[in-house]
């Protein structure tokens, strides 16, 4: 009797959710598994879900997908004679007898409600809570998220398994390229990602004009104009580059040539850019909060993300100390090798196998 994996959210462009799902499916190949997906997945038997309800279609697609999940997915589950539904994001049918295991990547709207709409907060507080309550088990990416599940939603510890993510070893590795004088940030411009303090910290470098700050991530009409106005006010327009979305194939080169990745997020469910940068041998400066110390270990400079002076000090150290850069590069490569999709897959199989 097969497991049914629901990838009905899968967009055409790579995202963290999609990367998690696709890499995990490769490791679940020994299970009897069917996949619902709007896109073709190499080497995986897929049953097509409607293409107009993926994350490419924003809120409209999300609303369609939620209705489809409640009223159509249970029928497919029965038709395929599935014994377990695996949901790589926290979306599942509430009004059916489907047995399911769900992955929750973070609960950031509950941790920072001031930066999210009432709709997003209610979605987490009620829909995701209900999905979790009806699930057989909850997988999450880190002990930090496991703590949030218990603290915010009251999920019993015995119902949660934290399984670390991994990175794409075929795409992220050390390239023998000359380092260029830019600090790199990878991520969205949302306030909880902390780009505003990063820009302030960069402006505080004593030799700021010798360096650039590259912000690689999709523009957001709510936040990007504010950041650009801040850059102009600080007089560093020529040194801060807004790169918008970077094609996946181009990321390794950009990461490899950065003097450091600076990732001062206030909260992350995992923080995959930290691991990807380490695999490339690029020094990392990141937050001492949430899951980021779990991911970075002793192979990065950990800073208080609320303290801009501390971020500046770390960037200054990277810019001026060759031995520090060399040590962090070497330690990062070694540390990143502790993470693999094989390990993630094996731990996930152990959880799913309990409920087949």
For each predicted feature, which ranges?
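Carbohydrate transferase catalytic cores enriched for Leloir-type hexosyltransferases
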Residues: 1-356
């Amino acid at each position: 009797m097969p497991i049914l994996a629901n990838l009905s959210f899968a967009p055409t462009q790579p995202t963290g959710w999609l990367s998690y799902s696709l890499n995990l499916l490769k490791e679940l190949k020994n299970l009897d598994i069917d996949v619902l997906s709007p896109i073709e997945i190499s080497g995986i038997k897929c049953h097509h879900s409607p293409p107009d309800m993926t994350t490419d279609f924003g809120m409209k697609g999300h609303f369609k997908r939620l209705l489809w999940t409640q009223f159509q997915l249970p029928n497919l589950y029965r038709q395929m004679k599935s014994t377990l539904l695996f949901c790589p994001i926290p979306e599942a049918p509430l009004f059916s007898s489907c047995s399911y295991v769900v992955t929750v990547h973070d609960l950031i709207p509950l941790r920072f409600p001031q930066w999210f709409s009432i709709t997003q907060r209610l979605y987490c507080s009620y829909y995701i809570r209900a999905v979790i309550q009806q699930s057989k088990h909850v997988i999450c990416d880190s002990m930090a998220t496991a703590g949030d599940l218990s603290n915010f939603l009251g999920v019993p510890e015995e119902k949660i398994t934290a399984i670390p993510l991994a990175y794409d070893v075929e795409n992220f590795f050390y390239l023998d390229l000359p380092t260029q004088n830019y600090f790199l940030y990878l991520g969205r411009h949302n306030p909880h990602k902390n780009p505003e303090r990063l820009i302030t910290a960069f402006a505080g470098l004593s030799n700021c004009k010798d360096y650039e700050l590259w912000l690689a991530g999709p523009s957001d009409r709510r936040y990007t104009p504010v950041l650009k106005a801040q850059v102009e006010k600080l007089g560093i327009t020529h040194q801060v580059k807004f790169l918008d979305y970077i094609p996946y194939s181009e990321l390794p080169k950009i990461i490899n040539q950065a003097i450091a990745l600076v990732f001062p997020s206030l909260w992350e469910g995992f923080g995959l850019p930290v691991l990807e940068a380490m695999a490339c041998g690029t020094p990392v400066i990141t937050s001492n909060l949430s899951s980021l110390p779990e991911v970075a270990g002793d192979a990065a400079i950990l800073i208080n993300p609320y303290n801009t002076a501390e971020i500046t000090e770390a960037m200054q150290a990277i810019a001026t100390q060759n031995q520090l850069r060399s040590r962090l590069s070497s330690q990062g490569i070694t540390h990143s090798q502790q993470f693999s999709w094989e390990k993630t897959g094996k731990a996930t199989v152990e959880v799913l196998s309990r409920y087949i």
